[in-house]
Amino acid sequence: MAKMINKTLVLTYIYLLIYIILSSGVILYNKWVLSPKYFNFPLPITLTMIHMGFAGFVAFLLIRVFKVVAPVKMTFEIYATCVVPISAFFASSLWFGNTAYLHISVAFIQMLKALMPVATFIMAVVCGTDKPRCDVFSNMLLVSVGVVISSYGEIHFNIVGTVYQVTGIFAEALRLVLTQVLLQKKGLTLNPITSLYYIAPCSFVFLALPWYVLEKPTMEVSQIQFNFWIFFSNALCALALNFSIFLVIGRTGAVTIRVAGVLKDWILIALSTVIFPESTITGLNITGYAIALCGVVMYNYIKVRDVKASQPTADSLPDRINKEYKMEKKSSDKFNPNDSVEIPRVGGEVNDEEAPLITSRLSHIGRTQLGNHAA
């Protein structure tokens, strides 16, 4: 029994570590590539299109050429009414989020991302997937106050960058709500590869119009450096992040992944001040962010409590570990790309770059059931 527990814990910590490294790495890498002070590729839409094109190409190879994953049954109606709107808001959230790197620091961006639960709750109420509640509203108010305090303490506050980031947050929140409303309504489940196969190309097309208007003229008149290996490794990291999130979802519970997400944010804030010396954190920044995080933690606690109350009694710890061990033994600890991912219920979590259907810190789902769900 002790061996089984240790094996499960070690694997869990390894997956969490991979997730934290990749998630932080993609954000810092994007900042480095886009920043005029470093690699100097100030074209966020172009960078996002490279990510989407690469992800779609890899997904196409895995599904159509190497037959690693079986394609899902996709009708024109589902594609037009579900995939297209989700892709539109996904593309918007990445576009606005990456553009924010040109104007504000990574540390301040992470602090603003604490608004994600507020944005998602508002969108969920507007779309009718959630109901206004006093306890949740008080937490949202606490988060908002914390972000305002943190913004007030920002030395290099930039209104343009802040607007871009907040707009991206609300676009991502609407994308999460649409994912729940549209895909769950159609009974469609997608694994990480099939989600990229359908959503990445569509997002690429949506980004083409603003790219043609805003960035193509700039590329024609200015000397933009293009290093193949830089962009290839950047896109590869973004793609790997998708799979790491999938592995973390399968190995950990909702509470664990939330704690990992909060830890990642603090690590990212600290790392960004070291890697990018121009990023300055004030006491007011930290105070405001701490207040906002208190609201986020309380909100997550309420959501987990609600889910536990609505679910049947969970298995005892020994039984659960035994089941996990049997599942691990059966799969020989190999990743099965045909496993589908249950679309999480919306709850307001910070998104990670390039994760079209899976949130980085799940709102309030339990353990995702892997292995026996057909893609």
From Swiss-Prot:
Main location: membrane
Transmembrane segments: 9-29, 43-63, 76-96, 106-126, 140-160, 163-183, 193-213, 229-249, 257-276, 280-302
Keyword vocabulary terms for this entry: Membrane, Sugar transport, Transmembrane, Transmembrane helix, Transport
Disordered, as annotated region: 328-348
Subcellular location: Membrane
Membrane topology: Multi-pass membrane protein
Domain of life: Eukaryota
Keyword Phosphoprotein: no
Pfam families for this protein: TPT
GO cellular component: Golgi apparatus; membrane
PANTHER family: SOLUTE CARRIER FAMILY 35 (PTHR11132)
Family: Belongs to the TPT transporter family. TPT (TC 2.A.7.9) subfamily.
Protein name in the entry: Probable sugar phosphate/phosphate translocator At3g17430
Source species of the chain: Arabidopsis thaliana
